[in-house]
């Protein structure tokens, strides 16, 4: 898929007398200097008119929402008629879709200002909500009333913080307040949709800050994390509470979903294994096993693939094991884990040490 082909489609539609625009994420990415993954198009033309314009290359893939897919030499392009959405009684999908006359009406139904921009074939931007300004300010902000946007589709709550993580942006104050006050709406969202957003969020450049600022949001679908927030480890090897250490550990490892999920859940069983010795030092004997058991349940609940779930649980159960730095010790571990997971385990151990205390950075560097 390419901008050149998308532009050609726009001009073809315009040649038939209908307005057409690139919309949503591709416009955002272009303004950020990134190559878009998808090229979505919105047009004043109705689905049947798009079918007439493109003939055998057009396929009705979402007529209920006014969407027709046009197959080109380099991929498939979705073209959706300008529309407005009705009420969202299920908090996920509009009860009814009504075709609109203008691009401004279409953009008004979108979730975030940075996703509510359009670009015509001449390069003119339609930006009624100052999404371009928010890109410059590096801010995630809802279109209109944030509370209303989240009531329409609760997944937008997680999408907002996901964009903050991935783009390295902050969340605008009113939007942030609405996220915290309406986080419970996420309870109605399917686990599969949660997992897609979380995979992206965890691999974002501002993941640590988002995890620390929005633990209450994650706690809706991973309530096991909440007891870790503010839980002092009472140990000379740790300068952070369990949850803060977790956020730093996630940030310290390569942005790959299995590794990031491993770090998010690697100490989730610490609260349940906490003891204090006579000297007042906290210990968490057996926490890798308990954390692994809890992680297995969490990953299954989120409908994670079996192989991914198994890898995450294995890495968690091994993350605190002492592997002798000998040919035999390394060989035994590699035989038990396989080469890929053994290499992952080294990354896990390094990130865990980096997130403990500044004076332990030498251990991470040794690993």
Locate predicted features:
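Catalytic cores of the polymerase beta-like nucleotidyltransferase superfamily
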Residues: 1-367
């Amino acid at each position: 898929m390419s901008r050149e082909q998308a532009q050609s489609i726009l001009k073809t539609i315009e040649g038939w007398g209908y307005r057409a625009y690139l919309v949503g994420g591709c416009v955002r990415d272009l303004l950020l200097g990134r190559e878009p993954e998808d090229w979505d198009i919105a047009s004043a033309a109705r689905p049947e008119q798009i079918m007439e314009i493109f003939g055998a290359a057009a396929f009705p893939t979402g007529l209920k929402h006014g969407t027709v897919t046009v197959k080109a030499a380099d991929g498939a392009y979705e073209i959706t008629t300008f529309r407005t959405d009705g009420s969202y009684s299920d908090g996920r999908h509009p009860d009814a879709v009504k075709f609109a006359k203008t691009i401004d009406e279409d953009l008004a139904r979108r979730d975030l200002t940075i996703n509510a921009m359009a670009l015509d074939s001449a390069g003119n931007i339609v930006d009624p909500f100052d999404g371009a300004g928010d890109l410059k300010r590096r801010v995630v902000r809802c279109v209109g009333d944030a509370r209303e946007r989240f009531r329409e589709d609760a997944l937008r709550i997680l999408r907002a913080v996901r964009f903050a993580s991935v783009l390295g942006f902050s969340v605008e104050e009113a939007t942030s307040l609405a996220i915290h006050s309406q986080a419970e709406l996420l309870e109605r969202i399917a686990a599969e949709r949660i997992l897609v957003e979380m995979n992206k969020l965890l691999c974002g450049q501002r993941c640590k800050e988002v995890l620390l600022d929005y633990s209450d949001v994650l706690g809706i679908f991973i309530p096991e994390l909440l007891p870790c927030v503010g839980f002092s480890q009472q140990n000379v090897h740790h300068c952070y509470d369990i949850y803060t250490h977790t956020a730093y550990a996630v940030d310290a490892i390569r942005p790959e979903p299995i590794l990031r999920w491993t770090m998010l859940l690697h100490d989730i069983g610490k609260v349940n294994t906490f003891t204090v010795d006579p000297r007042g030092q906290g210990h968490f004997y057996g926490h890798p096993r308990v954390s692994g058991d809890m992680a297995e349940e969490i990953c299954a609940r989120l409908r994670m693939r079996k192989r991914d779930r198994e890898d995450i649980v294995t890495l968690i159960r091994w993350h605190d094991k002492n592997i002798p730095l000998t040919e035999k010790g390394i060989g035994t571990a590699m035989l038990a884990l396989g080469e890929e997971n053994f290499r992952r385990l080294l990354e896990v151990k390094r990130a865990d040490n980096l997130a403990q205390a500044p004076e332990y950075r030498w251990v991470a560097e040794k690993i």
